[in-house]
Amino acid sequence: MDTPRDDRRPIRIQRITVTLRSTSLILLAALTLSGCKPTPSTTASTTPIAAPAADASTTGSITGVVHFDGKPPERIAIDMFADPACARSPQPNFTEQVIVTNHHLANVFVYIKSGAPASAVPSGTPPVVLDQKGCRYIPHVIALQQGGTAEFRNSDATVHNVHTLPTQPNNQSADLTEPAHSKPQTEPFNAPELMLPVRCNYHPWMNAFINVAPNPYFAVTAADGSFTISHLPPGTYTLAAVHETLGEQDIQITVPPKSIAKASFTFATR
């Protein structure tokens, strides 16, 4: 049959005689149709989700101590007498930037820096508490997992303020006024960040630090410099220790199945 040949011929002529306006319309239609195609979502790859539970029969842990080498800087006495309520707190009070006991360093944030997947805090995890007591932030350093919340309390008989100063855009700055013995307020922290400063606008000596970890494997050293990170899947990790004024140190550490790996860091005055 000759019908197919006849159908093709007028189409060929139509394409030759098409105007610029028609060409533009055809291109616009093609672009519109291509734009209707679904594009892959990047949310799953950029937004951390709760990590699956590790096999409890194989997990291990890391225990260690953070040491301080040399003579620690002298802690400076704080004058709280500008506020009568603060003046009634136990005196004297001292700065907390570097606290060393028997060559062991407190308030160091220790966490798995690499080797563990980033994950958000599981739903229902209680907030981490930062209290204002004795006109101080207690504890001086706190840590939570990204996606978690911090709860700010005021246990004092005077007004306080919680002013957070994040550098990560996904962590919103908070400037919270908290009257004496007021109801606690909470704030979310959605992005990993180290040593995020907290200040009180009413009492300039008050300061603390919030650490937002990318995974659930972290700790803050106690007064004796000790720390423990539990429930780690077997593997090799980069373990980081971060101090507010002394900086950061990293080491490689391997956690065998059902075992305890030992770690040690040593800081000194810069």
Question: Which residue stretches match the model-derived regions?
Answer:
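Bacterial N-terminal signal peptides
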Residues: 23-34
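Extracytoplasmic copper-binding redox domains, predominantly the cupredoxin/blue-copper superfamily
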Residues: 36-270
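Generic N-terminal leader/processing signal
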Residues: 9-14, 35, 197
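Bacterial N-terminal signal peptides that target proteins for export
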Residues: 11-25
